[in-house]
């Protein structure tokens, strides 16, 4: 699962197709939900900083998570390109 940890406003300006948005400051209150998904999580954000924090936070509670870094650099299709 691709987890975009930018703000809702940033996410709404464009995001990786199929990604889920939970802003970094809301990760803590969503840990149980994310752990129950039982899937590996790739975090992303605008620069890679917030996604790194989120990946460490998820990993600390036993969730398989890696920092995918800046979603801009992945060059995957975004919702803006698919419309």
Which ranges hold each PLM region?
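Short, surface-exposed ligand- or partner-binding patches at beta-edge/loop junctions that are enriched
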Residues: 44
């Amino acid at each position: 699962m691709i987890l975009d940890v930018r703000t809702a406003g940033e996410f709404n300006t464009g995001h990786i197709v199929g990604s889920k948005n939970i802003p970094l400051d809301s990760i803590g209150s969503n840990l149980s939900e994310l752990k129950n998904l039982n899937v590996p999580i790739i975090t992303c954000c605008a620069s890679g900083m917030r996604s790194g924090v989120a990946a460490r936070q998820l990993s600390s509670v036993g969730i398989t998570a890696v920092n995918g870094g800046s979603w801009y650099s992945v060059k995957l299709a975004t919702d803006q390109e698919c419309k």
